[in-house]
Amino acid sequence: MSEAAMKKVTESKAAIIEKIQMSGRLVVQSPLCIGSGQDDGITDSLVLKNKQGKAFIPGTSLAGVLRDIVCSHDSNLADLLFGNLSDNRQSMINIDDVLLENSVYTVRDGVRIDGITNTAEDTGKFDYEVVERGAAGSFSATITIRKNDIEDKKAVEQLAAALADQLMYGISLGAHTAKGFGEVKGSKIKVATYDFSQPDSLGAWLLGEMSQADIYAAAAKPLVADDDFYAEIDLALKTSLLVGAEPDAFDKGSGKDEWKVQKVMLSSNGDYVIPGTSVKGVIRKQAEHICRVVGDYGDDFLGSLMGYSKADKAKQRSRLRTYEVYLGEGVEAVNQSHVRIDRFTGGHMGSGLYTNKPVWQKKADAKTMTMRLAISGCSDAEAGLMLLILKDIWTGQLAFGGDKAGGSGVMQGLKAVISYKGHKYAMEKAAGGIKVSAEDRAAMNSLVEAFVKAGVRA
């Protein structure tokens, strides 16, 4: 290329002045459900796979999630990096598909519950395929900064670092994210910046080397909005716990039917788990109960928070997000036999003996699990409602899993940290109750009062 032609290229507004390369690994932390829109006649929804039958995360899905995160903080920055159709602004960023390795596929069941009768709806049973946690793949994204964007170069560089930090902290994508699915975290995410005005840096980009690039090693830091609510509560298991799953051949055993195990505790990648769907269901039911007892909140209050899907196709995405709850090594599974009782005679029913295999805590009052929930765009009234529900979980007023009538699924709170509007509230178990500072107690009481006032109608 002649000197004149080179000068013309470098003076063009479309000339590339910098490349930012983001790279690392993404690891699936909870079941991932990115549906293909197809079924196989047995499972209602199958995971998206390539022609070789391997699951992958589309780059478009990652771009959509990251754009939504940025947009919640600064819509102008989101338009700058990801483009805007109305302004004919093209996207600066290109994100590759993430091909998942070591993928294990399982099928999760679901059932639609009638909110009034608390029973399953007719034809409400469904299932879907998921990629179990532990699958991982290589992540790569490239940001191209051109001469006409030179004034925004610094902002884009800072945003790239912030997105890398967010990936290290974790994002949620795919279906059922409000119920704990699709949690993905980055591993060893690096941001390499190549300044094309420097020959060595340009050469390093062309050769795929990082030696001449400005490297940023990302750390786990989320982009959190001021009105986001986040709670993390450490729990011990007071009773048995059984979120039912079909037993394998070993648990089924042989011999008489009544001695065979009918249900075992659900597990995911070797760890016992309370699904986010179960946590969401328990919280929603308790929220409905509290709202009915405390005041007149109408359908809009919980509909805006929990989401809805109506017969007229009107939909609202849930702003409440629950997560899968994984149990540690402090529990063990034990066979537990039951006898069905005839409620008229008080005697046992014929063929009424059955056996399940729930889990029990080995050591009393030791941390067994951590339950998390988050609300985006949370109001004071919604935060107050969540505090009441967290109190019910802490004190064992709410139970999870099956056999609740028999006392199963009861928790005991040990420690909790709640973040809202830039403040952190801390609670710990203490003799005779909950240890919390006077300042935090007053602030949390004001949030509960805001919830009560929201239910007062003129």
Each PLM stretch: what is its role?
Residues 1-458:
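Small/polar/charged residue-enriched interaction surfaces, especially the RNA/DNA-contacting tracks
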